[in-house]
Amino acid sequence: MNLNRYDLISLRLFVSVVELGSLTLGAKEFGISLAAASKRISEMEAHVGQALLVRSKKGVVPSPAGQAMY
């Protein structure tokens, strides 16, 4: 993943998801589907080689790597 405009959007999405505690709410805030938001976060995780979010039925919280990125 190269640093470009797409990455800036992904980083802003990541921050939104962390602050809202929800991938669904983060996607809504950006006007994109849950699948698109999940794909962007997954691409970021693949780029850094670690999970950035801990997902559960109650929502999401940043992993240790996600906390460092946040």
Regions found by a protein language model. Name each.
Residues 10-14, 30-32, 60:
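A broad helix-preferring feature
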Residues 33, 40-43:
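Residues within the DNA-recognition helix of helix-turn-helix
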Residues 28-29, 46, 67:
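Alpha-helical residues within the helix-turn-helix
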Residues 45-62:
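A short LG(V/I)-centered, amphipathic sequence patch enriched
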Residues 35, 63:
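Residue-level signal for threonine
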Residues 1-20, 38, 67-70:
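Short alpha-helical elements of helix-turn-helix
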Residues 15-31:
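Short helix-boundary/capping micro-motifs
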